[in-house]
C-alpha cells in the first residue's frame, strides 16, 4: 500500500510528515499506528523484496485503481457532490458511504443515485460489492510491485472497504502475516482501513479522502471519517464522507469540502489540514516506501498502539454520539464566542444541552455562538439575558431545550431581577413592562420562533454547512419543529406575533422574558399574566407564521429527524394539540418536568420564554433576518407595541378602560388563544369579555389572544401567588376557576409583583386603571383598592381589610367581614360575603336572600346594588355606586360590594369605567370598564371578587382571603358559570378573576352583561356552584373523590374481605389444613419427612414431641408463619383488604380457636370434641388401626409414625378409631375417602358449626367468607384468595377430615400413616 501515511491533521495524524511513517503512527496514535502497521505490513508483507518493490514501485495504477481513481476523482463536482451526498443522505437515510458509492455508480446523477439507493441498492450491498472488487484487486495485486501499487490503488478501495474492514484487523499486528504476499497487502489494507476508519482515519482521510473527490466518497468515506473527526476519524472526511463514515454521526452533511473546515467550527483545522493533506496525499503514497520501512520495524509496536487506540477510538466512533468529534471544540467555541460570561454559565447548561445537541447544531452554536455573542453584544441591554441566552442559547435549539429544561430557575431569577430592573432596562418603564410582556411572549414565542428560526437558521446553515447542520437541526429541530409546528398549527395569530417590532431590543425581550416571567409570576400586571400565555400564544401565533417557513426547512432536517428526536412527538406536540391553556401548562411542565405549582407554569414560561428568548436572541445572531421578522413578529405578538402602548405605565393607565377594551378587542383577536380560553370561558365572556376585563388585563397583556389566554393562564396562574401556590391545580384548573380568582390573586399579587416587577406598569398600574389591567384589582387597587385597601399587597390586609371594613360596615356587624376576611373561608367570604354580607348586608339589598344564595347574583344586578342591592339601581347604583362602589367596593371586597359591583357591576360597568370606587370592582371598573357590567356581575358573583377578579379588588380582597378569593373565583367561576354575574362577567371577572384572568378580560366584558343577568340567574346556583367548585377544588386537593371510588372498591373488598379477612386468614389457616396435607407434609416434612429422613423413630418421636410440646410450637410457628406472611401480604399485597386484613389478630385468634376447635394437631380432639374426642382421635387412630388391619406393614409403619407423631392421642385415637372405623376400614379407601368426602360434604358443616362454636370466627368466617366469595365483586385480590379460600375451605374441611383423609391415606398407604403423623404434627402446628 502506498505510504499514505498522510496523517489527517484532524485525524490523529498529528505529525503530518508523510515520510515519517512511524512519526505518523505516533501522531495518529492508533490511526497512524495502523498506517504504520499496514505499511509495515506492506513491507513486512513477508517479502522483503516485495517491500522493496513497493518502495521502488512507483504506484502503477492498476486498472481497478484507475477506475477507482476515475470514479473517485471528480473534483470538479465535489461541491455539488457534497450537496448531492448530503441530499441523498437525507433523502435515502442511507449511509454516506452507500450514498457516495451510489453517486459514483450513477455518475453523480442525483436522481439516478437516489433510485439506485432506494430501489436497487440493498442495505450494505454496496459495501459487499466493493469488497468483492477489492479482493479481486488484492488478489490481482499479489506481486510485491503490484502490492505497492495495489495497496496504493486500493487505498481508495480500502477506504471503501474500510468501513467494512474497519474492525477487520484492529491490531496492526496482523502485519505479522504480511509474509503472505497479497494477504499481507490485504492485511495492510485492512489495517489501513481500520486505521483510517479508526484513529488512523484522520491519517487516512487526510491521506486519502479529501484530495480526491471520489476518494472523498470512498477514502473520505473512511478516511474523511476519521481524519476530520480527528480522533473520531468518523466525522472527519468530506461532508459526504465524513458524515457517514466520519462521524457516522459526524457532520453528515458538511459544508463544501473546502468549507468543511469553516463549516465545522471545530473541524476546521483538522479538515483544512486534511484538505491540504489531500493534495499531499499523493506524496504520501510515494512515502509509502519509507513508511513501510519504518513500519516494518515498529510495526508490532505500532500494532499495539493501533490496537489500543484503534480499539478505543473504534468504540467511541462506533458509539454514535451525536456530539461530533468537533463537538467539544465547537461547544467551547460556542461557549467562548457565544457564551460570553453568562454564556459560560448558560453555556454550561446550554453546553450540556449542546452536547446532547447534534454536532451540526453545535456548529451552529459555534458560529451562532459567535454570532450570538456579537448579537448579544449588539443587543447590549439584553446582554445579560443574551449572555445567558447566548451561552445557554448558544444554539437556539439547544437554548430552547436548555431553556425548557434548565432555564426556568434562571428565567425566574432573572425574571425577578429583570422584573424591576430588567423590565426597566428592557424599555422605558412602560416600555419595560411592554418589554417584559413582549419578552415573555417573545420568550415563549421566541422559543417557538427561536425554534422556528433556529430551524430555519439551522437549515440555512445546513445549507451553508451542508455537513454538520443537518443533524443538529434534525436532532433538536425535529422535536422543536414538530412542537412548534404544532404550535404553528395552533398558532394563534401569526399576525399578532408578527406585529411586534424588534424594539424590545431582543435583549430587553430577553430581560423581559425573565422579568416578564417574574412579571408573570408577579403578575407583571396584565402583561405578566398575559405574558406567558401571550408568549405561548405567540409561540403559536408568531411561530405559526415563522414556523410555516421553518416547518418546511425543518422537514428537510426531519428526514433525519426520526432518530434524533427522542422526545415523543406527541409530547412535544401536546401543547399545540390541546387548548393552549391546560396543555400549555402541562406541556411546559412536562418539558420542564416542573410540577411545582409555581414552577410548572410560571417557571415554565420563564424558562420556556427565556429559553425562547435566548434562542430568539440567537436568532438575532443566528437568524438575524429571520429573527427580525420573528422578533418583530414575536415582539409584536408580544404586544410590544401594544404593551408599549397599553403597558407603558402612563399609556396603559392612560388608556381608558374603553381604550383598553378596544385594545382588548384587538386582544380579542387573541381570541385565538382567547377562544381556547373561551373554551374555558363558556361564558362567552372570553371574547367580548376580554375586551372588558381581559381587555384591560389582557390589553396590558396586549398579546391579543395571548393576552386573553395569558391573562387567564399566565396572569392568573403566574400572577397570583395563590395560583403559584396552587399552580399545579391552578394551572389547569385556574383558567376556569382559578384563573379567575387567581388572576384576582394574580391581579392582587400581580399588582404587587407588577409594582415591583413592572415599576412602570406596576407603578402605573397601582396608580391607574392600568393597575386594574394589572390585575384589575391592582388597577382597582389604584383607585378602588386604595380605598378598598385592595392595594395589591394590601390586598389581603388593606384591600382585604378595607373591604372587610366596608364589608363589616356595610355588613355591619355581620361576622362576614371577618368571614370575608375569612374570605380565606371561602364560603364564608364568598358565601358569607355574598350571602352573608350580601345577605345580611342584603339588608341594604332586598335581594339579600337570593343575594346570599346567588350572592344576590340572581339579584344579580339589583342585588348587586351590591351594597345598595339595587339591581337596576345597580346601574344607577353602580354610578352612585362609585361611592357605593367604594362602599360597594368595600362590599365588593366584602363581597357585599359584589352586589354593589353587580349593581356597580352594571353600573360598575359604568363605574368600572369611571368607577374609581368601582375600583374595588375597579378592576371591574377599570379592568372591566367596559366589563363593568361584568365587574358588576363579577361583583355580584364574586362580589367584586369577580369584579375584583375583573377588578381584582374583590378578588384581591378575597384573594387576600386567598382561598376565599379562589373559592370566590371558583364560586365565581361556578357562579360565573352559573352567575354570569361575577362569574359570567365574573366569568369574565370571576372567571376573569380566575379563568377570567384571561377570561376575565373577556369574561369581564361578556361578564358584565352576563354577570348581572347570568349572575342573577346563576347567582342562586352560585352557592351550589361555588360548592361544586369548592368541592371540585377541594377534590383536587382531595383526590379522595376518586379514592373513595377506589376506597369504595376498596371498601367492598374490605367488606367482603372482612369475612374474607378471617376467611382469608382462615384460608391461610385452611391452606394450613390443606397444608395439613401440605403443611403436614411440610411440617411433618420437617418432623416426619425430615425426621423420617433423619430417623423415622425420631420422626415418630418428633411428632410425639410435637404432640405435646411441638404442637404448640408448630401452631405458633406454622400458624404464625402463615399469619405473618398474610399479615404482611394483606398489608403489602392486599393493601386495601390488607387493612381489613388488619384483623390478622382475628385470624390468629381464629387460629388458636380453630386449633382449639380443630384441635391443633388435635383438630381431631376438637373434632372429637364435636364428635367425641375419642371418636375423633380414634378416627385418626382407627386409620392407623385400620391400616394395621388392612395393611399390617403400613399399619406398623403408620402406627409407628403416627403413634410417634401423635402418640398420646394417637394411641387413644387409634383404639377408639379402629373400633369405630373398623367398619369403614374394611373398605378402607372408600370408607375413608368416602368419609373424607362425606366429611367435606357432610362433616364440614357440622365441623364448621363445631368450629363456629369452638373456633367461632374460624368456621363461621369460612362460612361467611364462603358467602362473600361470590360477593367478592373485586375478585382480583379477593378472587384469588377466595378461590383459594374456596378450595381451602374445603381444605379446612379436609383439615378436619385431613386426619380422616390421612386415615384413609394411612390406611391406604404407609405414607398415609406418615401423613397422619403429618396431620397430627400439622394440627399440633395448628395448636
Curated annotation (Swiss-Prot):
Basic and acidic residues: bias regions: 44-58, 180-198, 204-215, 1287-1297
- The answer to keyword Amino-acid biosynthesis applying to this record is no
Report the residues modified as Phosphothreonine: 657
* Biased amino acid composition, Gly residues: 7-16, 226-253, 420-431
BP GO annotations: copulation
- Location of the protein in the cell: Cytoplasm
Annotated keywords = Behavior, Cytoplasm, Phosphoprotein
Where in the numbering of this chain does the UBA domain appear? 80-120
Q: Biased composition, Low complexity: where in the chain?
A: 33-43, 140-156, 376-396, 507-520, 614-638, 759-770, 779-792, 854-867, 873-906, 1298-1319
GO cellular component assignments: cytoplasm; nucleus
Q: Spans of biased composition, class Polar residues?
A: 488-500, 532-552, 749-758
Give all cystine bridges in this chain: none
- Region (Disordered), start-end ranges: 1-65, 129-311, 335-439, 488-552, 601-638, 749-792, 851-906, 1182-1219, 1236-1256, 1287-1327
Residues that bear Phosphoserine: 656
Which PANTHER family has this protein been placed in?
PROTEIN LINGERER, UBIQUITIN ASSOCIATED PROTEIN 2-LIKE/LINGERER
Q: What does this protein do?
A: Acts in the nervous system to mediate the control of copulatory organs during courtship.
Protein name, UniProt field: Protein lingerer
Q: What is the lineage of its organism?
A: Eukaryota, Metazoa, Ecdysozoa, Arthropoda, Hexapoda
Coding gene?
A: lig
